[in-house]
């Protein structure tokens, strides 16, 4: 099993920029990789006020993770700040 751990600088509270950068990294290392492990809260960075950064459980970030994993025939793991029923979670 080939596992790649990705660690990067995060563009604070900018999911589009962070996902685009992760997309480039995954594409560059996709050959033969079975699992990519992304940094914790890779799409936004940490924040003491999750109200401003939390995503829905069907966010563009999570859809991207599923799509990229299907395209590359691999697994992608990483956590995202998610809001559900008025509560906030660091969901892995």
Protein language model regions, located:
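Active-site-proximal beta-strand elements of phosphoester/diester hydrolases
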Residues: 1-10, 14, 91
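Cys-nucleophile CN-hydrolase/nitrilase-fold catalytic domain and related Cys-dependent amidase chemistry
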Residues: 15, 24-91
């Amino acid at each position: 099993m080939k596992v790649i751990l990705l660690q990067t600088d995060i563009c604070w509270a900018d999911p589009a920029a962070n996902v685009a950068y992760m997309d480039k990294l995954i594409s560059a290392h996709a050959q033969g990789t079975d699992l990519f492990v992304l940094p914790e809260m890779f799409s936004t960075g940490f924040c003491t006020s999750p109200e401003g950064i939390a995503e829905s459980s069907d966010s563009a970030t999570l859809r991207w993770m599923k799509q990229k994993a299907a395209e590359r025939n691999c697994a992608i793991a990483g956590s995202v700040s998610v809001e559900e029923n008025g509560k906030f979670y660091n969901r892995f």
